[in-house]
C-alpha cells in the first residue's frame, strides 16, 4: 500500500501535470475542423458524388454559414448506374449548406467520361439548376480542339456547354457548313 501511494505521489509531481498558457478565443471555438475527409453525397438513397479533401473548416456562425474545403479537393460525380460521369479537382472550395452550392477556386479542372476537359480559376456549382457557371477565363478541350472564353454555363457532365466571349478553333461538321454558292 505504501508503495502504491509513493508511486501515485511521484506521478502527480511536477512532470505529471502540465499547465497550458494558451487561451482559446470564443471565435475559434465556433469553428469546426476536420482532416483527411471523404464525404458521400446522396439524394433519395442514390449516391451522386464522392468528395475527398485534406481539410474541412466549418463556420456555422458566418452569414451565410459555410464550409471551407482547403488543401486540394477531388470530386467524382456518379450517374444513376453508379458509373463516374465526371470528376472535378481544385485547390480550394467553399460549400454553402443552405442551398448546397459550391464556389470552387484555383486550378479548377473538370473532366467528363469522354475526356472533355474544362479548366478555369473559378467555378460555381448551382445545385438548384444542376449547372456549373463561371465569369472568368475558361479553356475547353474537346478531342483535338481547344476553345477559350470568358465565362460559361455547363451541366455537370459537360455534355452541354455554353461559352461566353468565345475564341479559338470551333469544329464544325461539313453538313453544318452554309452553302457558299
Description of each model-found segment:
Residues 1-181:
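Mature-chain termini and adjacent capping regions
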Amino acid at each position: 500500500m505504501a508503495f502504491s501511494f509513493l508511486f501515485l505521489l511521484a506521478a502527480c509531481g511536477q512532470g505529471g501535470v502540465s499547465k497550458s498558457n494558451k487561451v482559446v478565443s470564443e471565435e475559434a471555438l465556433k469553428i469546426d475542423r476536420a482532416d483527411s475527409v471523404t464525404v458521400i453525397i446522396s439524394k433519395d438513397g442514390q449516391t451522386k458524388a464522392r468528395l475527398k479533401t485534406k481539410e474541412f473548416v466549418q463556420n456555422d456562425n458566418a452569414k451565410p454559414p459555410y464550409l471551407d474545403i482547403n488543401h486540394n479537393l477531388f470530386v467524382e460525380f456518379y450517374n444513376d448506374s453508379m458509373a463516374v460521369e465526371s470528376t472535378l479537382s481544385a485547390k480550394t472550395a467553399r460549400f454553402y449548406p443552405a442551398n448546397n452550392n459550391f464556389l470552387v477556386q484555383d486550378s479548377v479542372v473538370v473532366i467528363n467520361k469522354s475526356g472533355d476537359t474544362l479548366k478555369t480559376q473559378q467555378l460555381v456549382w448551382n445545385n438548384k439548376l444542376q449547372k456549373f457557371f463561371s465569369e472568368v477565363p475558361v479553356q475547353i478541350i474537346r478531342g483535338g480542339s481547344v476553345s477559350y472564353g470568358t465565362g460559361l454555363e455547363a451541366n455537370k457532365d459537360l455534355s452541354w456547354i455554353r461559352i461566353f466571349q468565345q475564341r479559338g478553333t470551333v469544329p464544325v461538321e461539313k453538313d453544318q457548313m452554309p452553302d457558299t454558292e
